[in-house]
Amino acid sequence: MSEQSTVPEQSASDSRRAGFVLGVDVGSSMIRCHVYDRAARICGSSAQKVESLYPQPGWVEIDPDVLWLQFVAVIKESVKAAGIETNQIVGLGISTQRATFITWDKKTGKHFHNFISWQDLRATELVKSWNGSLLMKLIHSSCRVLHFFTRSKQFLAASLFTFTTQHVSLRLAWILQNLTEVQKAVEEENCCFGTVDTWLLHKLTKGSEFATDFSNASTTGLFDPYEMCWSKIVTSLLSIPLSLLPPVKDTSHNFGSVDEEIFGVPIPIVALVADQQAAMFGECCFQTGDVKLTMGTGTFLDINTGNNPQQSVGGFYPLIGWKIGQEVVCLAESNAGDTGTAIEWAQQLDLFTDAAETEKMAQSLEDSEGVYFVPSFSGLQAPLNDPCACASFMGLKPSTNKYHLVRAILESIAFRNKQLYETMQKEIHIPVRKIRADGGVCKNSFVMQMTSDLINETIDRPVHIDMSCSGAASLAGLAVGFWSDKEELKKLRQSEMVFKPQKKWQEYEVNMGNWVKAVKRSMNWYKT
């Protein structure tokens, strides 16, 4: 278990007296906590690596007891690093990985199993069975007819709906079908279900609070973003009792206080938010048409669609960004896997020592000498949607060296960004206002500049790239009046660099055309 704590030089005695907010991000690979002052400066930080468990092929779990200890530890360490007292914390905001869930005993609080990660594939056969079923075909055809006559977006969404293993829905159905302890607890109405946010809230309040927020609920596959409630249709289809599911609250909301036995003082828990939505908020993408490009383990492209959920054919799905009082903000999101994963894989092959080296390695060449990389260790997502695609290098020659391989990997990330952006433009008919990037890979200026060139848009990179922490803290700060409104947050956000298009699309056209050929040859490689 690795950990780190840092404290910037700017911690000042006057700001210490003013109070602070905490932003915690529980990600798939790391759990981070930052302490923010009123100027939104990071005064202290702590991070630990989240360890995934692989009990069987395709199964991905997280030990809840270990995660809990890490959560408590990063808060204590970040407060210590900031040189402040816990009683100076005026609010806690929690951002979490999405669609990772657990069930537990309502009376004792004891969990029935480990967290089932959003990456877990145990429900693959259930997904195939449901998506290929006569019932799903009937639902799709009926909703297509209803959409034709009514033009209702809700019927369009239903006509395109398919289950995936990333949804909670069928992984939860698998648990209900296969774990007798859970079945018994459900029958006795003694079972609670929760994503990471709900479980942490339950633990922090010693069992007194049971809730989630709209952003987390909307990513489960069990929530109807049009009706803004748990879907009675989906839960009924899968025999999931509504009584299992937590009440859905505003994103910036008083969820209760941390039991004072944990940190010595009762810290207010005033924001629960899903990680991509938190990053969107942290980037101050508050207006319709604002776009966020997160490049981390995978790439997520989100556009603010106002208060209207937007469904597309090519792979953009509707989510609730956040709900604060009467304000409901919807997003359309799509993703590409294996962004940071590809870079980490190359590092494991000793193509470089530090990921920071890759920028100069790529820039030292005119081109990749006809070498192309397909980043599909976990298949290809939108707009190609092929889970059977394989990762590959193509165009290798005796003269190919590690510099060509690294450049090809970085180019593939930019090419996938271009594909996602084009799909968004074709299917989400909302003019783009601005684009902001975050995530670890956005530190790579080669990828950033090439993406800017390919999409012919200006892209803003912030000073601090941990936008999920920032968004959680911002939502918490608004809830307690630490910051007055979103206009104040906009003024506090700091831009590190703005990338403007330097090359025309024509200069990339042949290269991207060849890369697309490589992608097509990698598709349908695996049988299942």
Curated annotation (Swiss-Prot):
Catalytic activity: glycerol + ATP = sn-glycerol 3-phosphate + ADP + H(+)
GO molecular function: ATP binding; glycerol kinase activity
Major place of residence: cytoplasm
Pfam families: FGGY_C, FGGY_N
Record has Transferase as a keyword: yes
Residues annotated as binding ATP: S28, S29, T297, G340, G440
Enzyme category, top tier: transferase
One Gene Ontology cellular component: mitochondrion
GO biological process: glycerol catabolic process; glycerol metabolic process; glycerol-3-phosphate biosynthetic process; triglyceride metabolic process
Keywords: ATP-binding, Cytoplasm, Glycerol metabolism, Kinase, Nucleotide-binding, Transferase
Pathway assigned in UniProt: Polyol metabolism; glycerol degradation via glycerol kinase pathway; sn-glycerol 3-phosphate from glycerol: step 1/1
Compartments, as annotated in UniProt: Cytoplasm
EC number per UniProt: 2.7.1.30
Residues annotated for glycerol binding in this entry: R98, D275, Q276
Known role: Skin-specific kinase that plays a key role in glycerol metabolism, catalyzing its phosphorylation to produce sn-glycerol 3-phosphate. Involved in skin-specific regulation of sterol regulatory element-binding protein (SREBP) processing and lipid biosynthesis.
Recorded family membership: Belongs to the FGGY kinase family.
Name listed for the protein in its UniProt record: Glycerol kinase 5
Record organism: Bos taurus
